[in-house]
Amino acid sequence: MTLNIRIIAPDRTVWDAEAQEIILPSSTGQLGILTGHAPLLTALDIGVMRVRVDKEWMPIVLLGGFAEIENNQLTILVNGAEEASQIDLSEAEKNLDTATQLLSDASSNKEKIEATQKIRKARARVQAATAATS
């Protein structure tokens, strides 16, 4: 048995396929989904979703959103998403360094919040790209 997964971003359908297992970055921590999971609606955080197809794990960066599972159908609505295969690790590491510098230079609360969000996104991209190459 498999899960039917559909990841939808505002500009495109990122993923529409079957998988055996999913690990989601929910707002309360990592959430594992297997076939036969109870119906659920959950908020997603910025982070790396891991999809197991056959015996291979594929990381996908999610930029927050919502996930609904019912009858082995997982629908994920996200603010943005990026497959690890599309991420340049050196560029992602550079973006993380830049975001970290922005946070240390931030003086207002707004600047700190924006820099923190950039760091979270950059960390997720580095994590996904690293996982894809190992």
UniProtKB/Swiss-Prot annotation:
Major subcellular location class: plastid
Entry keyword set: ATP synthesis, CF(1), Chloroplast, Hydrogen ion transport, Ion transport, Membrane, Plastid, Thylakoid, Transport
Keyword hit for Transcription: no
Compartments where located: Plastid, Chloroplast thylakoid membrane
An MF annotation (GO) of this entry: proton-transporting ATP synthase activity, rotational mechanism
InterPro entries in alphabetical order: ATP_synth_F1_dsu/esu, ATP_synth_F1_dsu/esu_N, ATP_synth_F1_esu_C, ATPsynth_dsu/esu_N
GO cellular component: chloroplast thylakoid membrane; proton-transporting ATP synthase complex
SUPFAM superfamilies: Epsilon subunit of F1F0-ATP synthase N-terminal domain
Membrane topology, as annotated: Peripheral membrane protein
Domain of life of the source: Eukaryota
The protein's role, per its UniProt record: Produces ATP from ADP in the presence of a proton gradient across the membrane.
HAMAP family in the cross-refs: ATP_synth_epsil_bac
Quaternary structure and interacting proteins, as annotated: F-type ATPases have 2 components, CF(1) - the catalytic core - and CF(0) - the membrane proton channel. CF(1) has five subunits: alpha(3), beta(3), gamma(1), delta(1), epsilon(1). CF(0) has three main subunits: a, b and c.
Family: Belongs to the ATPase epsilon chain family.
PANTHER family according to UniProt: ATP SYNTHASE DELTA/EPSILON CHAIN (PTHR13822), ATP SYNTHASE EPSILON CHAIN, CHLOROPLASTIC (PTHR13822:SF10)
Protein's recorded name: ATP synthase epsilon chain, chloroplastic
Originating species: Pyropia yezoensis (Susabi-nori)
Organism lineage: Eukaryota, Rhodophyta, Bangiophyceae, Bangiales, Bangiaceae
Gene from which this protein is expressed: atpE
